A protein has these predicted regions:
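Stable alpha-helical elements in mature extracytoplasmic
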Residues: 125-136, 205, 209
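A short acidic-to-branched-hydrophobic micro-motif
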Residues: 100-131
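Secretory targeting and sorting signals
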Residues: 1-28
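A short, structured loop/turn motif at beta-sheet edges
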Residues: 120-125, 156-161, 184
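Short, surface-exposed beta-strand/loop micro-motifs that present aromatic residues
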Residues: 100-106, 176-183
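Surface-exposed amphipathic alpha-helical segments
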Residues: 186, 190-215
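N-terminal "mature-domain start" segment
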Residues: 26-100, 206
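Short Gly/Thr-rich strand-loop-strand
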Residues: 68-78, 131-178
Length: 215
């Protein structure tokens, strides 16, 4: 329970009258400790640690797209995305207090889905990281040497604790998946969908992935 300065003064006077100045000092110290513990923190994070339950899996992807994929261990040196050069997910994350996990789904004849997810120390850190990634991908709308490229970013959800954005991908003007960036609470993630699915399916997958990441 927080006490006002006036309440502290009254409490001090009462305690001093009964038990002396030492008791009053102890009451004041107790209040300070309680107040310090109750101060709001920008480092609020979900209670549960990251796990495989927080990343998309074969069943979820099938439910959204109707495409069957097999899960494999992701490459630890996975780059951020197909058009951001050698930049990795780690390169854009905060330097301290971060835990990462990942997932890779592989289909027949080449299609794949790679998700990279991280737990930061605060909602602010996660949102700032997501915004930086959106900027990086927005600057490289096309991949040199081919017909593959991204369209303009589309915001699926945006509020104080959640942001979900995707870039529709095209190959020779045909829909070819997309790139998802999201932050939910103190978590931030990206999903590279290299599959011939529609933009509506990518948008649906983006929302579902954010929901799963925030569990």
């Amino acid at each position: 329970m927080k006490l006002t300065h006036a309440a502290i003064a009254v409490l001090t006077a009462v305690v001093t009258g009964v038990g002396g100045g030492a008791a009053a000092a102890q009451a004041t110290n107790d209040h300070r400790e309680t107040g310090a513990q109750s101060l709001p923190s920008t480092a609020q994070t979900p209670q549960d640690a990251l796990s495989e339950e927080n990343v998309i899996r074969e069943r979820l992807y099938f439910d959204v797209t109707g495409h069957s994929f097999t899960r494999v261990d992701p490459d630890q040196a996975q780059t951020l995305g197909p058009c951001t050069g050698e930049t990795t997910f780690t390169d854009v994350l905060p330097r301290r207090g971060v835990k990462r996990i990942g997932s890779k789904l592989v289909g027949v004849d080449g299609p794949y889905v790679v998700e990279q997810l991280a737990q930061t120390r605060s909602t602010r850190e996660a949102r700032a990281t997501a915004d930086e990634i959106v900027s990086l991908v927005n600057e490289c709308a096309a991949v040199a040497g081919g017909d593959f490229g991204y369209g303009d970013p589309v915001t699926v959800q945006s509020n104080s604790s959640r942001e979900v954005v995707y870039f529709p991908a095209y190959d020779s003007d045909a829909a070819a998946g997309g790139y998802v960036v999201f932050s939910v609470g103190a978590r931030v993630g990206v999903i590279d969908v290299a599959d011939d699915v529609s933009t509506a399916q990518v948008a649906h997958l983006a929302k579902e992935a954010a929901n799963v990441a925030g569990m």
